[in-house]
Amino acid sequence: LQQCVSTLSLSLIRSLVAQVQVNGVDIEYEISGSGEPLLLIMGLGGQLTDWPQEFVDRLAQHFQVIRYDNRDSGLSSYSTVPAPTRWELIKGNLKPSSIEPPYRLRDMADDALGLLYALDLDDAHIVGISMGGMIAQLIAAGAPTSTRSLCSIMSNTGDRRAGRPTPGVVASIARRGQPDRSEALDVTIELFRLVGGRDWDEHEQRVRSAASLDRAYNPAGVLRQSQAIAASPDRTQALRQVTAPTLVVHGLEDTLVRPSGGVATAAAIPESRLIMFPRMGHDLPRSRDHELITAIRTNAARANAAPSRPS
């Protein structure tokens, strides 16, 4: 009976999938659970369905969880600007001022804030992963009254000296072209084999990635989002102004954004807390769900115990 009740409670917290227009962009989102709002921001090319469902369900037992597709991914709006070539991306990473992307990370942060405001929410706990961590950092630095707490997972500060991928990962990504739909799943799994930690579960990843690819496939959007990252400035100085309680999480086996990215992020944000998980790479292994969710809840509680945020 207890198991049946638990299963029923998890099914009931999956409540609403909808779309709203903000900043001239249609944003697909999903709301689960009840409680204080918590916004999940996905990484490069990821969709809202790329958050492990069990992780979302467990969070939704404590928060009103809002996850969404960034612009140029999933079921949100796609840019009509042609995707950059591989050479243009390399050039942009070497010299950010040489490119003019259709949008930057700042625009993506404004999308997230616009979604909150469209949902009639003044603020939320902000949790971002990888590129989503970069977006979350910009929200916390630029909109302190909208940020109850910040959790930046396997991300960096934009300082190109910190969190650099390993040479092997760089070489592997550089060798790849843009896969067609029939190849995309195998290419995704091959990448996770490179960047995932020892606790990464290939079967779970394959099932989740296959479902996301069936939902939407936009390789050009991945290139444009990559260009947005390359064109966005170092956030280190801005992060020194963050006042929200902050948790920084990184896997010690991350080869895509190496652990120095998390260390630099924690060093830049006053009074932040840093957790480095062994056996975790650039992934969210189920084995860390309990510890990660507990840490997120603890950080959120710091917000409730803190003095009022600046106006």
Where do the model's predicted regions map?
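Conserved HGGG/HGGXW glycine-rich cap/lid loop of the alpha/beta-hydrolase fold
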Residues: 25-92
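Conserved acidic catalytic loop of the alpha/beta-hydrolase fold
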Residues: 106-124
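Conserved hydrolase catalytic core segment
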Residues: 122-161
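Flexible "cap/lid" loop of the alpha/beta hydrolase fold
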Residues: 150-179
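Conserved alpha/beta-hydrolase catalytic His-Asp/Glu region
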Residues: 182-224
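Short beta-strand/loop motif that positions the catalytic acidic residue
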Residues: 242, 248-250
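Acidic catalytic loop of the alpha/beta-hydrolase fold
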Residues: 253-257
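Catalytic active-site module of serine/aspartate enzymes centered on a nucleophile-bearing elbow/loop
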Residues: 272-311
